[in-house]
Amino acid sequence: MKKIGFIGAFDKIDLIIYAARILTELRKRVLVVDTTILQKAKYIVPAINPTKFYVTDYEGIDVAVGFENLELIDRYLGDLESSYDIILLDIDSSEMFDRFNMQNADKLYFVTAFDNFSLRKGIEIIGDIRERLNMTKILFEREIIKENDEYLNLLTLTYPIDWNREKFYFPYDQGDLTAIIENQRVTKIKLKNLSEQFRDSLLMLVQEISPEIRTGDIKRVFKEL
């Protein structure tokens, strides 16, 4: 079972759910865990009887909300380890990073835009992490600006973070935001209305999470969704 962490203050639950949707279509058993303070998944993922903590199905994805560690999810489900191939965790605090033992994750992504809150709050989260870690950047920008990446490197220069060479750029524009909001409104995951750059980056992200999946199979799913 792979454990993948998406770290940062930026709103990333939709991105995580989109990646999970593609993976489930490719016969991967995926659990999305929203550990964030706002628990946005509670409001965008339909649930029949939402309680303080629960797991619900959303288009083949299991989504967990309200849990404080993986042990509680395991107790809730009965057997977490054998139930899923991949767990994708949305984390926006160093406390939850520790509670979910993300230092042992198979992959860690730092997700941010370059507004002051997303950037500085996100850096504050990873600044509180004590272990030295490898992380991959997922950057949301209206256009790719080299200086933004260099600025992020400068701000984290003294932090115990080794940035991987590869990085993912997602467009931060009105068209994709409109498509995401429409998906939330109809509670349906549709990828066709997203921009080509967004879909290309999403494809590469899914491929990195599960490199055994063929690119052609991922492209087929994009056409179907």
Predicted regions: what they are:
Residues 19-28:
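A short, Lys/Arg-enriched amphipathic alpha-helix followed by its capping loop at the start of a domain
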Residues 12-20, 122, 202:
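Short, highly selective alpha-helical patches that border small-molecule cofactor pockets
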Residues 2-13, 29-86, 92-95:
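P-loop/Walker-type NTP enzyme "switch/lid" segment
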Residues 189, 193, 208-215:
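Regulatory and interdomain segments flanking nucleotide-handling catalytic cores
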Residues 17, 86, 91-171:
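Conserved catalytic-core segment of NTP-binding enzymes
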Residues 212-225:
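P-loop NTP-binding site
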Residues 47-66, 75, 125-134, 157-166, ...:
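Inter-domain helical "communication" segments and dimerization helices
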Residues 146-200, 204:
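Beta-strand-loop-alpha "switch" segments that mediate conformational coupling across diverse proteins
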